[in-house]
A protein has these predicted regions:
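Conserved catalytic core of the tyrosine transesterase superfamily
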Residues: 1-183
Length: 183
């Protein structure tokens, strides 16, 4: 955490101390990585911050960031190249990075250290549901037949299969018949 924190503006330490009581260390680390990407974006893409080192950004820079800047950031993180390596974020990644930014801005806004909170004006991107992939009736029958018969198994595998065949068929029948998810 300290290594990542050292690459951020000094005022970020106050944020991490402030949220320490109600966030896990993993959450704070994820925030740090996400904020680093945001500040790198500001440094390379935003004229307000381009002349300064990231570690030298003053807190007042947060008041000069607009809603449009944050929307440009979300567009930027869809696909970007850093140090010759390509990075991309799907809807879920963008949502997480925006949530980190909202928490960051909310902390300073509630502490009355900044006057504006442009992150609050940016709607969280909608996350589309993943399509459920289902087996058709023939595929279910083939799967159950394979479990019952245990074809193409070695002697030791066949010995183990004979002991667990009824259990395996029962479990698969339960999962396939009720739609219980294994996750």
């Amino acid at each position: 955490m300290r290594e990542v924190e050292a690459t951020l503006p000094s005022f970020c330490r106050q944020f991490f101390r402030g949220v320490q009581e109600y966030t896990s260390s993993r959450t704070r680390l994820a925030y740090a990585y996400d904020l680093r990407v945001f500040f790198e974006f500001l440094h390379s893409q935003n004229s307000v911050c381009s002349g300064m080192k990231i570690t030298e950004f003053p807190l007042s820079v947060l008041d000069r960031i607009t809603r449009e800047d944050i929307e440009e950031y979300l567009d930027y993180i869809t696909y970007y190249v850093k140090d010759g390596k390509e990075y991309s974020n799907n809807e879920r990644g963008k949502k997480r990075k925006l949530s980190a930014l909202k928490s960051f801005y909310n902390y300073y806004f509630r502490s009355e250290l900044i006057k504006t909170n442009p992150a609050a004006l940016v709607p969280i991107p909608k996350q589309h549901e993943k399509q459920i992939i289902r087996l058709d009736v023939d595929e279910v029958a083939i799967l159950l037949d394979q479990v019952e018969e245990g074809e193409k198994l070695t002697k030791s595998q066949l010995k183990y299969h004979n002991k667990t065949k009824l259990r395996d068929v029962a479990l698969l029948t339960l999962l396939l018949g009720t739609g219980i998810r294994v996750s």
